[in-house]
UniProtKB/Swiss-Prot annotation:
It catalyses: Endonucleolytic cleavage of DNA to give random double-stranded fragments with terminal 5'-phosphates, ATP is simultaneously hydrolyzed. One of its GO terms (biological process) is DNA restriction-modification system. The type I restriction/modification system is composed of three polypeptides R, M and S. Belongs to the HsdR family. This is Type I restriction enzyme SauN315I endonuclease subunit. Keywords: ATP-binding, DNA-binding, Endonuclease, Hydrolase, Nuclease, Nucleotide-binding, Restriction system. Its EC number is 3.1.21.3. The gene is hsdR. NCBIfam families: hsdR (TIGR00348). It comes from Staphylococcus aureus (strain N315).
């Protein structure tokens, strides 16, 4: 049977959308798009216009107000009302989207709209709501990687989406059998923000036909755009909610408005509960019969975090309460429908000010409780419940309490909240790519196998600090971490947390790391944090120090490393700085290993954290919460969260995964065995060799389809290698896997050469190639050790008086440059070669090699600008101005560019603009490091 063509798929979709209720219209260019928009605008505002449609001047004034805006600003305008001055000086307000009565909007669909700006483009399927193109659908025929459609959208958005197309809210991409949706944005579109749609039971809806049936019905689509897309005010981005978030909010709203019952939402850690709970809170706060929505968090440190998150989603949506009296005032303020506070403050407010809160004894109040397994167990909840007689309680948790892991008083989450309204389990999140799976190692630190036996009496007998914290064992664990940390974290590209059983253990490990660190060529950056008790027990004199003294030393070490000034009197500030450090790094440096007891193991999200070292006992919710610190999605170089256990927690891990994934099959959550990945590698390697038997044969490939096959085959191989490297037993040798590291490096060099070739051809020619939209996943190829700084370090070590040694160093650098995989290093490759060949031999021992290289680059950059400007007959200084602007903004200033190009014919103008944009981007990257 022949495959379905892209044209047939598009035609099938157009027919289906027409059947779903869209009006099929023919719009082929920008003029027809504007005419259609104007007609609908007049129809929708007929009453306000009083029989006088917008004149040409009035419509032009409107276009001036709404055109040329950023995607973020356009999204705001879409949801707002816009005042328009008419020719007779009267003023009317125009709206572009009915956000409440979704079905009252006008729905149209068209296809093959052609746009010609800098580049030509023809869009597949465009959905118009009230005449504005709000959803763009890009299709690929069956069998084509869906990522090619994603990359095509990125290319179109960068080159072609102007005018009313700036109002696109959402993209849908499909190859017929796989379909995704994602929000439009000014910033770079990320693959991690492409979402699957699913049903309420989290069954994925993949085919384009079933996706359209469920997601693209006119009223449903308008509802999705109006209610379930969020304007993030802080980051100035549009966010589309995922299906499970939508279903949870719908279920919660229904429970709150149609019943008087409570309920809870079980969404796994890392799945975006804050956004879900915010949207539910926001919608409930707009209901007339609900007098107040109170969002409760448990801990002080989460209070500000949650407020910050909420205000991202709607500026000023939350008034954080700083003290009890302020909370009472806010509760009585009718202009504040939504409040974020802690359960501790709420309990105090009731205890001391119950008479001021009398109205809430009968008024309907809704409490939304974040991480309810922490905040809802205890006397404070009972106190709040006794006062608010007509309240409903809705909890959000990633790890509910069940009979197996119930609270101290034996209650489960269901005992307190009643029915579970929606679930999204860890296996669902991993399947959808919303969180990562885990690679778990168990390192035996005892020679005596009896210590791993099932005998409980033996386990109890050895479960003492004396055994676990024996000097030899602590050093053994520390050395294992030091020896393997670079492998686990991809040469320190990622951070890690080390959790231990007690403050005493934390101190001992910190001091051991500190001692062993001194012997390392590249010392690890270690930090420790814990909460000390002012009047702590000295354990009968066993520990000859107060823990505060040790924390002071740790903070002092931290201050020296990061140029800060914290002390044990400012532990909150120290905590916040560490939190920021582990999330993003500080001043080009970051913590490699953070040692904790319990801190940072719940409620802390960091995409650049990928490894958890464990030397303590963990069970059920504590284990899942701790493991989940590592599994936030980042990029291709982070395929899983790495867990290294120095205790045998195999049973505890299996039990926790069984409970919280509701299945005995943990294969979807844990990485498969080494042998399985090895077999997968062998199959992929054979496939690669069938396409190109040797690396140098890549150079002989003329056919683009064949080149594409090579790219796809090596990309798959590289992904498997990334996973194999996580296993201790992996050896990159012919004996072990049939391929050695050198052969892989040779194939990788050819792969990167194809990438460079495609990138260069795309920049230089207005030509569409089947390779344009291939996803090369370059991040996966990077080795963060071999970069520009690495090369500069070798250059600094050159003995300028020893010519033989100098030649050896030069040859070493040439070999490294031949196999460079760092993008910036590849750009600088020719520069560095010329520097070591022509400049280094003439230097003497008194010369500063760094300064010499800076001078060399400066001369080369000046020559490049002069040469390019002369060749194109453009003003060199104007070119430098554009380049300087680009360096800070990342955007080529269109006004400066237009002025520089002047009055060339359209075709020549397009060619010149493309060449200048490409030159500016490449030279900025090349000379910017």
């Amino acid at each position: 049977m022949a495959y379905q063509s892209e044209y047939a798929l598009e035609n099938e979709m157009m027919n289906q959308l027409e059947q779903l209720g869209y009006e099929r219209v023919t719009i082929r260019d920008n003029k027809q798009l504007l005419d259609n928009f104007r007609t609908i605008l007049n129809e929708r505002h007929a009453d306000k216009l009083e029989g006088n449609p917008l004149t040409d001047k009035e419509f032009q004034r409107l276009l001036t107000m709404i055109d040329g805006k950023s995607i973020f600003e356009s999204a705001r305008i879409l949801r707002d009302k816009l005042p328009l001055r008419r020719d007779d000086e009267s003023e009317i307000y125009l709206s572009f989207l009915d956000k409440k009565s979704w079905c009252k909007n006008k729905f149209q669909v068209t296809n093959q709209v052609s746009v010609e700006d800098t580049y030509k483009a023809r869009y597949d399927v465009t959905i118009l709501i009230n005449g504005l193109p709000l959803v763009q659908v890009e299709l690929k025929r069956r069998g084509i990687d869906i990522n090619e459609a994603f990359n095509q959208v990125k290319r179109y958005r960068k080159q072609n989406y102007t005018g009313l197309f700036r109002y696109i809210q959402m993209f849908i991409i499909s190859n017929g059998v796989e379909t995704r949706y994602f929000s439009n944005n000014d910033s770079e579109l990320l693959k991690s923000h492409m979402f699957y749609w699913s049903d309420k039971q989290n069954n994925r809806i993949n085919t384009l036909q079933s996706f359209a049936e469920s997601f693209m019905r006119p009223c449903q689509l308008a509802k999705m755009i109006s209610r379930y897309m969020i304007i993030n005010e802080t980051d100035r981005i549009l966010m589309a909610m995922r299906p499970y978030q939508v279903y949870a909010v719908e279920a919660l709203i229904q429970q709150a408005t149609e019943t008087g019952n409570n309920g809870y939402v079980w969404h796994t850690t890392g799945s975006g509960k804050t956004l879900t709970s915010f949207k539910a809170s926001q919608i409930l706060s707009q209901q007339d019969d609900i007098k107040k929505v109170i969002f409760l968090v448990d801990r002080k440190d989460l209070d500000s975090q949650t407020e910050e998150e909420f205000n991202k989603f709607a500026k000023g949506a939350v008034d954080k309460t700083f003290n009890t009296s302020q909370l009472v005032r806010q509760l009585n303020d009718k202009s504040l429908p939504l409040i974020v506070t802690t359960i501790q403050k709420m309990a105090k407010a009731i205890q001391g000010n119950a008479h001021l809160l009398e109205q809430y004894k009968t008024n309907k109040v809704v409490f939304i409780i974040d991480e309810c397994h922490r905040s809802q167990f205890g006397d404070m909840h009972r106190l709040v419940k006794q006062h608010f007689k007509n309240a409903q309680y809705f909890g959000f948790t990633g790890t509910p309490r069940f009979p197996e892991n119930s609270s101290q008083d034996g209650r489960t989450t269901a005992d307190i909240f009643g029915r579970c309204l929606h679930t999204y389990l860890i296996r669902d999140a991993i399947h959808d790519g919303n969180v990562l799976g885990f690679s778990v190692d168990y390192i035996n630190t005892f020679k005596n196998k009896a210590l791993k036996a099932e005998d409980n009496s033996m386990v109890e007998a050895i479960d003492t600090e004396e055994v676990w914290l024996a000097d030899k064992r602590v050093e053994l664990v520390t050395r294992h971490i030091i020896n393997n940390h670079d492998k686990y974290t991809r040469n320190r590209q990622y951070s890690s947390i080390f959790t231990v059983q007690s403050i005493h253990a934390l101190i001992k490990y910190y001091e051991t790391f500190k001692r062993l660190n001194k012997k390392l060529e590249q010392p690890l950056t270690i930090a420790g944090i814990f909460t000390f008790k002012p009047n702590e027990d000295d354990r009968d004199g066993e520990v000859p120090y107060h823990s505060r003294e040790k924390l002071e030393i740790m903070i002092s070490d931290y201050n020296k490393k990061f140029e800060t000034n914290f002390s044990t009197d400012t532990t909150n500030e120290y905590f916040n700085h560490i939190s920021k450090n582990v999330k993003k790094g500080v001043k080009d440096s970051k913590i490699d290993i953070l040692i904790v007891v319990n801190m940072f193991l719940t409620g802390f999200d960091s995409k650049v954290l990928n490894t958890l070292y464990v030397d303590k006992n963990l069970m059920y919710h504590d284990l899942i919460q701790a493991y989940s610190r590592t599994n936030r999605v980042e990029k291709e170089s982070k395929p899983f969260g790495k867990i290294v256990n120095y205790r045998d927690l195999k049973k505890e891990t299996d039990d926790a995964l069984r409970v919280f994934s509701q299945t005995n099959d943990t294969d979807t959550i844990l990485m498969r065995s080494y042998e399985e990945y090895k077999k997968e590698f062998m199959d992929a390697y054979r496939e690669l060799k069938m396409i190109v038997p040797t690396p140098h044969m890549v150079d002989d490939i003329q056919d683009e389809e064949e080149l594409k096959r090579f790219v796809e085959a090596y990309r798959l191989l590289a992904k498997i290698i990334l996973r194999l490297k996580a296993f201790d037993e992996f050896e990159f040798t012919i004996d072990e896997i049939g391929m050695d590291e050198q052969e892989n490096e040779d194939y990788k060099s050819k792969y990167l050469a194809v990438y460079d070739q495609v990138k260069r051809a795309t920049a230089e020619k207005n030509k569409v190639s089947i390779l344009n939209d291939i996803d090369f996943e370059i991040e996966m190829m990077r080795n963060d050790t071999i970069n520009v700084n690495y090369i500069m370090n070798i250059l600094r070590q050159i003995d300028l008086e020893d010519k033989a040694e100098q030649r050896r160093n030069q040859e070493q650098i040439r070999r490294i440059l031949d196999h460079a995989d760092d993008p910036t290093l590849r750009l600088k490759r020719d520069l560095i070669r010329e520097f070591i060949d022509n400049v280094v031999p003439s230097l003497n021992k008194d010369d500063d090699i760094d300064q010499e290289y800076v001078n060399f680059e400066s001369i080369k950059k000046e020559a490049e600008f002069k040469g390019f400007a002369g060749e194109r007959s453009i003003d060199e200084q104007a070119l430098k101005t554009i380049s300087n602007d680009y360096q800070y903004s990342g955007v080529v200033n269109p006004h400066h560019l237009k002025k520089m190009i002047g009055d060339l014919p359209l075709k020549e103008k397009r060619k010149a603009r493309k060449a200048i944009e490409s030159f500016v981007a490449e030279t900025t990257e090349k000379y910017g490091v």
